[in-house]
Amino acid sequence: MKSVASPLCQFHGVFCLYQCRQCLAYHVCDGGAECVLLHTPESVICELTGNCMLGNIQEGQFLGPVPYRTLDNQVDRDAYHGMLACLKRDIVRYLQTWPDTTVIVQEIALGDGVTDTISAIIDETFGECLPVLGEAQGGYALVCSMYLHVIVSIYSTKTVYNSMLFKCTKNKKYDCIAKRVRTKWMRMLSTKDT
């Protein structure tokens, strides 16, 4: 979804109109019945646009059934596993090129790939990131950014700054997904559930 920023909308102060990049349908993101609300620990956000809805939720939203979306088509297994393999390789490649990440690379890398433990954790948590791949422009880069953010936050012994780390935290929805991945990752590490 992209915000409609036409001169007419700006003149009348309408900043809640969005247009789907794929089907070109319009969405009024005002917390009403059209919004698909996602409850996070910090706030309530519209899943379609990523806008924070706290304090802007219309009462009619709670009177009917909660809207939800389903997958339109099945996931291609070969593409899914190919993407996982690329993700694991790219995570290590990115970390090897950054300064101050030697300790992290030693913890998670095995050659050009990740260790078996890290591989199992990524396999288990990747399902959380599927919505990002389907609806965001540059979805793969966002997913890489999420995993890099999670890995650096868990394995780093000092502060690491990189633009790739902050790409996933600009949008509340993607930040929420990254937090779910991190929570699941930490649970799997603490319970040795890999």
From Swiss-Prot:
Main location as per UniProt: host cell
Location in the cell: Host nucleus; Host cytoplasm
Signal peptide segment: 1-25
Cellular component aspect of the GO annotation: host cell cytoplasm; host cell nucleus
Record Pfam families: Herpes_UL92
Keyword Signal included in the entry's annotation: yes
Keywords: Host cytoplasm, Host nucleus, Signal
Job of this protein: Plays an important role in the expression of late genes. May play a role in viral replication.
Family recorded in the similarity comment: Belongs to the herpesviridae UL92 family.
Summary of subunit composition and partner proteins: Interacts with ORF34.
Name of the featured protein: Protein ORF31
Naturally occurring in which organism (per UniProt): Human herpesvirus 8 type P (isolate GK18)
Gene from which the chain derives: ORF31
